[in-house]
Amino acid sequence: MARSAAREAAMQLIYEHMMGGSGEETLGGMIEFVPDRDDARYIETVTEGVFAALHDVDRYIVAFAQDWAIDRLARVDLAILRLAAYELLCMEDIPAAVTINEAVELARKYSTEQSGAFINGVLGNLNRKLEREKDESRSGL
């Protein structure tokens, strides 16, 4: 399984959980059938991380969704944003450009072209804020 496929599976689990499904139970069953241990570990880490940090992840999404309340976002777009925002916030080993590009590709596949542009904007703004904060902490400001 390629990392893109693992990311797609993680997004689907997050979406399932949001729609009232048992994402956690499905996760356990899915992990058994993922042949690559790194991909299985990624899926488990990111889905559990999103569930555990949901309030913080959503706070960042709302901050950069410019006049969009979280309950007005399309559910699939929100699942993609939650996955990608978590990666940007907590998984520094994944390049931000990869995270953002993969999120846009997921939006194009599962949502609309407009969603891809919206997700790109939200994540791009979030990433710029995080980069500024890193620069400030390095310079001691």
Give names to the regions the model predicted.
Residues 1-141:
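N-terminal interaction/assembly modules
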